């Protein structure tokens, strides 16, 4: 059995969810969900979350793109829905503002040694987030990303500080 099957980008979501629900009932899959990487589709995803028909959602959330904090993340917490974050680096755009800059000294408080870890820890420290899935084809980037698993996670006040710090770099 599969652990998780998701309807990608909400393509024909109602039809596919019917199949996935049956597969879940049959024990072929443990969890079912839906994904989108488009903020314009958050309302559709929210509707699915409210329907009680899915166990997981996957959407974009990062230090730049924080729209999900308004409705999706609180709703996931409220409903006990797992959250997978895609595009945590916004296709590398989060690095544009910080190229050539060192991470702030205070990032050492939560064991960050590079910007990738800073950005990933911002994401995975949100109480609603189950995991983030940064895409990379480079081993050195994967190793940097894995470093975000080490040490403590930022608390809500530190998360605010991280977002403010990043926003002020613009």
Across the structure, where does each feature detected by a protein language model lie?
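Glycine/proline-rich, positively charged
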Residues: 1-67, 71, 78-84, 125
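Structured C-terminal cap/extension of enzyme domains
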Residues: 51-56, 71-170
């Amino acid at each position: 059995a599969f652990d998780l099957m998701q309807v990608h980008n909400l393509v024909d979501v109602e039809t596919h969810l019917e199949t996935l629900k049956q597969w879940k009932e049959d024990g072929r899959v443990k969890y079912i969900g839906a994904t989108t990487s488009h903020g314009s589709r958050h309302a559709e995803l929210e509707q699915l979350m409210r329907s009680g028909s899915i166990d997981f959602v996957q959407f974009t959330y990062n230090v730049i793109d924080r729209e999900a904090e308004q409705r999706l993340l609180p709703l996931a917490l409220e409903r006990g829905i797992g959250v997978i974050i895609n595009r945590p680096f916004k296709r590398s755009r989060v690095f544009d503002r910080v190229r050539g800059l060192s991470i702030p000294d205070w990032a050492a408080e939560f064991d960050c040694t590079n910007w990738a870890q800073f950005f990933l820890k911002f994401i995975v420290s949100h109480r609603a987030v189950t995991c983030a899935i940064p895409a990379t084809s480079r081993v050195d980037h994967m190793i940097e990303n894995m470093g975000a698993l080490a040490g403590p996670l930022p608390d809500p006040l530190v998360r605010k500080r991280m977002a403010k710090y990043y926003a002020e770099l613009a």
